[in-house]
């Protein structure tokens, strides 16, 4: 591309005074700041910056496995979305499964996660189908950013219920829907 490499600068300093100076005194020199770091840094930038920022505090991300999903693909996607790097804000924190696939999919998908050290929080209904260890999910789990090898599992009746759950508890960061058939226009296109 023909973008001048000087348009983007990386500030490699952990000195908070440098950050404070950029946030409060550099508005005429800096177009936008993209903070990368922990919640405390991002929160500080959001609260104090006089410079426009692109940032977020949390990533409560969802992966919905729809009734027409293919098991092998769903297992790969869920595994990658949760286990590739559990401590990033883009990792899946809640897996939502359509009720029609829980019996067939849960032991493969959740078993793979558990085998790789992931703690599973699920509803009472999940225990009817999943043979591994389940910790009882509470309301708090739906809005928890674990940032670790833990995941909550929600069972829903349909796509609309999945979308409602994502919209209620998610941070609109990194959500995915796994399905085999894609028809447009669909609620998948506009409601998450």
Regions found by a protein language model. Name each.
Residues 182-192:
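Single conserved hydrophobic/aromatic residue that forms the stacking wall/gate
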Residues 42-148:
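ALDH superfamily catalytic-core signature
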Residues 33, 98, 162:
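Residue-level signal for inorganic ion chemistry
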Residues 27, 89, 168-171:
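Alpha-helix termination/capping residues and helix-transition junctions
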Residues 88, 174-181:
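A short, aromatic/hydrophobic, helix- or strand-capping loop or linear motif
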């Amino acid at each position: 591309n023909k973008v001048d490499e000087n348009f983007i600068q990386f500030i490699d300093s952990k000195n908070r005074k440098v950050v404070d100076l950029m946030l409060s005194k550099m508005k005429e020199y800096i177009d936008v700041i993209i903070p990368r770091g922990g919640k405390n840094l991002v929160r500080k930038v959001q609260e104090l910056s006089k410079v426009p920022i692109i940032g977020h505090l949390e990533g409560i991300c969802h992966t919905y496995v729809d009734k027409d999903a293919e098991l092998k693909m769903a297992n790969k996607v869920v595994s990658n979305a949760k286990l590739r790097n559990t401590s990033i804000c883009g990792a899946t924190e809640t897996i939502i499964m359509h009720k029609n696939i829980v019996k067939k999919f849960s032991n493969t998908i959740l078993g793979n996660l558990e085998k790789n050290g992931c703690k599973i929080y699920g509803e009472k209904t999940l225990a009817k189908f999943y043979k591994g260890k389940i910790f009882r999910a509470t309301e708090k789990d739906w809005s928890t950013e674990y940032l670790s090898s833990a995941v909550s599992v929600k069972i829903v009746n349909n796509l609309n219920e999945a979308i409602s759950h994502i919209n209620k508890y998610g941070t609109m960061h990194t959500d995915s829907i796994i399905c085999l058939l894609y028809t447009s226009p669909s609620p998948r296109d506009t409601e998450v």
